[in-house]
Regions:
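Bacterial Sec-dependent N-terminal signal peptides
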Residues: 1-39, 43-49
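Beta-strand/beta-sandwich contexts
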Residues: 34-75, 128, 133-135
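Hydrophobic/anchoring residues in structured secondary elements
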Residues: 53-56, 81, 93, 215
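Immunoglobulin-like IPT/TIG beta-sandwich domains and homologous Ig-like subdomains
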Residues: 60-122
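N-terminal structural segment of carbohydrate-active enzymes
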Residues: 123-242, 246-262, 272, 277
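Catalytic metal-binding/acid-base residues of hydrolase active sites
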Residues: 268-270
């Protein structure tokens, strides 16, 4: 009678092969000599480098707010506040130790400065003030553009240079500005737009659509990666200093409104620049 292998024979063979495979695996060898994982410092005061969004508004239709907190090892902090009608619904700790999501409920909260207290298990604390502003008007009171409007789309950098002093900003990655080079920044800015608003009204334009004016702080690589167009955002809450300031942007919009011009704010949310902290 022929003796056929039984199931137990195959199991023994499989276990032997698996054992040999593990012994010879490069991964096994690497793991045996790998450096220990970095121990995060949970004893120092929490490092709160940045909070996004930079401020928010009371009496929004949706009272919930997500704060993205950035700082070294901030993942391990707890967060509390004693501001009236501000409730911390939850904390979400991400894979990265340097981010923490804080979900707030602002139902009934009045405008003011919220003290957010970040604390570690050793009792050390960091307090950050977070501004809750009053809304100028409800969203339902704002009128957007429609089919009756004549839109003029433009790149501010390519329109008019009203303030040559902001062509190059010390400390920014891109230090190049040259109108003779097609791929570099040319120096156009918000002040240049403000000085020529009558040009648009004379054309019969009723709405201006600016390509993004938010910060695009990355190297131009001699024009290979220039961001004069504005589509490589590195800060969603700051106008690029080479265009002007947040205050100048608001002033421009107010002046446009006085002249019967609407302003479309172009913002890119499906991607950001590769120099953004995210």
């Amino acid at each position: 009678m022929t003796n056929y292998p039984t199931l137990s024979h195959f199991q023994k063979i499989w276990k032997t092969l698996l054992f040999l495979l593990l012994l010879s695996s490069p991964m096994t060898a690497q793991n045996s000599t790998a450096a220990p994982k970095k121990a995060y410092n949970r004893t120092a005061s929490p490092d709160v480098t940045r909070i996004d969004p930079t401020n928010w508004f009371a009496d929004m239709q949706d009272p919930t707010l997500q704060l993205m907190v950035y700082g070294k090892d901030i993942k391990f902090a707890d967060v509390t506040t004693d501001y009236p009608n501000v409730k911390i619904d939850s904390l979400v700790r991400l894979d990265s130790p340097n981010y923490l999501l804080v979900y707030l409920n602002l139902k009934g909260a009045k405008p003011g400065e919220i003290n957010l207290t970040f604390s570690n298990k050793n009792g050390k604390k960091t307090i950050r003030k977070y501004q809750l502003k009053a809304r100028e008007m409800a969203g339902t009171d704002r009128k957007g553009f429609d089919i009756s409007d004549v839109l003029y789309m433009l790149m501010p950098d390519r329109f008019a240079n009203g303030n040559p002093k902001n062509d190059v900003i010390k400390g920014m990655e891109d230090q190049l500005c040259n109108r003779n080079e097609p791929s570099l920044r040319h120096g156009g800015d918000l002040e240049g737009l403000r000085q020529h608003l009558d040009y648009f009204t004379d054309l019969g334009v009723t709405a201006l659509w600016l390509t993004p004016v938010l910060e695009n702080d990355r190297p131009a690589d001699n024009g290979k990666n220039s961001t004069y167009h504005g589509y490589a955002t590195t800060d969603y809450y700051r106008v690029d200093p080479r265009f002007g300031t947040n205050e100048e942007y608001k002033a421009l919009v107010n002046e446009c409104h006085k002249k019967g011009l609407k302003v479309v704010m172009d913002m890119i949310f499906n991607h950001c620049g590769d120099y953004h902290p995210w």
